[in-house]
């Protein structure tokens, strides 16, 4: 035998071979045929069981025997893959109508493996036989099997639209399919309407076929997604569990799950919900129990007293497989090629298949009826000359001679002569001619009817409709999945995710933040806070773990930090720098921090810059879901800094003080609400080389404490301030000196909460009591507190 060697490039060989392989797994493994809704291995399993007589009316047989038949005759692959496919056809949580009945352990909705095939037994279900009905009447084409020892069907007759009824899922080279199961009665009704009106629209079809009907039930949301899928083959719906609420004897409530989304692993779902409880991702769940038994699926989620059960349910919908999205991808083999198909195309392909099946069956039955009628006519003729026929047969040498004599003498056809000689003489003499004439009459009517079906397309369609109606009547069942038109927005109360706890929030001037338990705070006291050298406390207050912290910086940005995300650190220990939580720039400085309990408020923030710009923005604008980077609070122009952020519940007076001692007081009602990216308007009309050092809210009982670079402190009462309009120059608060004039480096509004001040130079600090500073008149420079020759020039002042 001579060898043939081809010189081919590796690129060409790989491309060609992979192309062949891809075509094979697309057509012969992973995708269903649109006509019978089956993949090749499924079709071979059902045909092997049918041809071996393993039908619904017989006893169960070992699954191993069927697997052996399939891999021996039709499917030369591993026995495990065949058995897995066989088991899936028997699982009522995978298929809307099972095609195989199985005795023994056939797996579970917990994804437990089935028992080995040597232990389980199986047979075809009654409905599966409707897929195979009339297969012996030349209804479909057969092809040689893999070793040419027998024949196998290319497709099954499929007397109901199995692709839509049981759906399909699979992945192949470059293609995937996800077709959901549907209600058999609805699918057949839609098919009947399509037969009556081939121009029927998807909207009209959806009056009959409402949407998917999953074997596990559940609630389907999103009519628009269903319609899109039925039109184009692709669409998205939401499938959520059926959850009911029960009240226990102790007054607690529990959520009872009785239906879960399609293809969701129950045990994994229970484990996930329990992990959320154990990890304290959700607050309010006491216990999760799987109470599933022979009566049906049941998962119990016991809740704490007085907890919002609706919010917990919504949290679980969002964070577990209690709710999933299902994506239609209706790809099937049509005319030998994978196609993305809408529901009209699927029904049309199925109907064309049924037209072919019924036509082939009718031709087969017509041929048999005509053959039988020919035989009956011969028998009637023979009975009319019975004595002569008997005499001729007796005088013949053998059966062959008798047959030839009948043809020659009485002009019987070969088929008629064969039928006569095959009858024993006693049967021939006892044959009732009346019965034969009756059969002849029936055959005449049958042939007429069959010819009418073949000659009249409407008659053929009526046969299909009648048979579909019979299947619908015999196998119809109630819809399992409830369909809701709209996809419900999931709203989760913060209380569900975060346990409510009162804690102490602290922020230092150098940007160290922490939350501390009230117990730790009370055990230490304010003075014992953990600080770095040169740092001091900017603010501390009692907040709730369900609150949100807004941290504002000199760059006009803010950090949105849920309190529960802050590390729980003891009061005596150093906190986290905000840059470890949300990255900020090296020269970015924290200027204020606020906590918000509810962003749905009429309160507002006021922002003031060093160069005299100001703006007002309402609190709801600051709510966000982005925690990982700083967000814009206000636009700060180049060579400017944000120096003050205030929060007010309603309009009130604010006072602006500048470095050169100018002061302007006006009402925030003069400011319009603006967006976060706005720069604002002019707050005060600044002199040349002057800048703002303070903008704060003020009231009649307050005083203002100012520090100058020369170590002087000046305290004035509210009555010195003159309420004016925004953007004016204001009044003078310092006595102007020609030599070494005082310049205000810091100023603060003093309320009843404040008792101490701290002065800072580059290397020193000085503490004192605010009440020791007497109130001054307008045109004074205050009292010297420190000697700058020893202390250094004052650069800042804080009050507490």
Swiss-Prot record:
Reactions catalysed according to its record: ATP-dependent breakage, passage and rejoining of double-stranded DNA
Keyword Ubl conjugation: no
Active site: 119
Gene Ontology molecular-function annotations: ATP binding; DNA binding; DNA negative supercoiling activity
Localization terms from the record: Cell membrane
Site for Transition state stabilizer, residues: 118
Family annotation (InterPro entries): GyrA/parC_rep (IPR006691), Gyrase/topoIV_suA_C (IPR035516), Topo_IIA-like_dom_sf (IPR013760), Topo_IIA_A/C_ab (IPR013758), Topo_IIA_A_a_sf (IPR013757), Topo_IIA_dom_A (IPR002205), TopoIV_A_Gpos (IPR005741), Type_II_DNA_Topoisomerases (IPR050220)
GO cellular component, one term: extrinsic component of plasma membrane
UniProt membrane topology term: Peripheral membrane protein
EC number: 5.6.2.2
Keyword Cell inner membrane: no
Site (Interaction with DNA): 39, 75, 77, 88, 94
BP terms from Gene Ontology: chromosome segregation; DNA topological change
A Pfam family reported for this protein in Swiss-Prot or TrEMBL: DNA_gyraseA_C
Root EC class: isomerase
Domain Topo IIA-type catalytic residues, every copy: 31-495
Family: Belongs to the type II topoisomerase GyrA/ParC subunit family. ParC type 2 subfamily.
NCBIfam families associated with the record: parC_Gpos, PRK05561.1
Subunit record text: Heterotetramer composed of ParC and ParE.
Main function: Topoisomerase IV is essential for chromosome segregation. It relaxes supercoiled DNA. Performs the decatenation events required during the replication of a circular DNA molecule.
PANTHER family in the cross-refs: DNA GYRASE/TOPOISOMERASE SUBUNIT A (PTHR43493), DNA TOPOISOMERASE 4 SUBUNIT A (PTHR43493:SF9)
Name of the protein this chain belongs to: DNA topoisomerase 4 subunit A
Taxonomic path: Bacteria, Bacillati, Bacillota, Bacilli, Bacillales
